[in-house]
Curated annotation (Swiss-Prot):
It is a multi-pass membrane protein. The chain crosses the membrane at residues 22-42, 50-70, 90-110, 131-151, 183-203, 221-241, 262-281. This is Hydroxycarboxylic acid receptor 1. Acts as a receptor for L-lactate and mediates its anti-lipolytic effect through a G(i)-protein-mediated pathway. Glycans are attached at N3. GO terms for biological process: G protein-coupled receptor signaling pathway; negative regulation of lipid catabolic process. It comes from Homo sapiens. Expressed abundantly in brown and white fat. It also detectable at lower levels in liver, kidney, skeletal muscle, brain and pituitary. Not detected in frontal, temporal and occipital lobes of the cortex, basal forebrain, caudate nucleus, nucleus accumbens and hippocampus. Belongs to the G-protein coupled receptor 1 family. The gene is HCAR1. InterPro entries: GPCR_Rhodpsn (IPR000276), GPCR_Rhodpsn_7TM (IPR017452), HCARs (IPR051893).
Amino acid sequence: MYNGSCCRIEGDTISQVMPPLLIVAFVLGALGNGVALCGFCFHMKTWKPSTVYLFNLAVADFLLMICLPFRTDYYLRRRHWAFGDIPCRVGLFTLAMNRAGSIVFLTVVAADRYFKVVHPHHAVNTISTRVAAGIVCTLWALVILGTVYLLLENHLCVQETAVSCESFIMESANGWHDIMFQLEFFMPLGIILFCSFKIVWSLRRRQQLARQARMKKATRFIMVVAIVFITCYLPSVSARLYFLWTVPSSACDPSVHGALHITLSFTYMNSMLDPLVYYFSSPSFPKFYNKLKICSLKPKQPGHSKTQRPEEMPISNLGRRSCISVANSFQSQSDGQWDPHIVEWH
């Protein structure tokens, strides 16, 4: 621990605003990504490179969600960290690693769609699932190398009434952490915007009556990727850039401090919104979700014999039996139907 001049702003509203935001992000993000992971693990028989990228995006988002209860507890205690030095380092590292991983794989998904739409005959489109898995492992290694410094530094700051655990220093620039924070936004932003523009432009040039529906689906998908990315990451990057531009006059400024904390919560909401990417990635994903919803809404009435004939069974039992048959039919069709590509390019 160190006793540096950490910012401690009394009477601020951060501790009141952050817990509800993080709780909402945790509940919706864990639910959405949990359902997505179940779909990948139990209803996906044929894996393709794009499937591998989307699966790792869901893994990064789900792991980030696991960290949010600890940050919620931190804010509920008025920014007092009660778990010690090592858990603080591990928590901040896990948050940064999975946030960066989510950005990387969201960018890879956009780039993968770019090659399939704009350059359908490029060699990138013929790589095997094993090669895609190797690419994923390399990307995870780079992400870990870029964030491992958070494990090597002490982030606790002891004050009179609390012990803070923050990855950002609000008194001055933060060196490598600020560099990584900016790079992991602006580089992917350039790639995603480029891919979005080229996909939309290419599809509009090739627009034909028979392809209009596919064009709309592909355009909608890439626009969802771009909107989710910009909405979740631009506010926090802008807040940090404003601080760096105005420091030292903005050091420990309550409004600047509060803006950074609140906009950082938007980056966690990226993991809550990424299920929209899965939803628009394939027509089979909405079908999977709807079938789960239908089966969960069917009432259960125990106590009926298993040997009942269909004409003697209550409607609710017939509904349950139909749900089981629907689920089995979905699983048997998943080989060919749950393709994570929106469009089939010939």
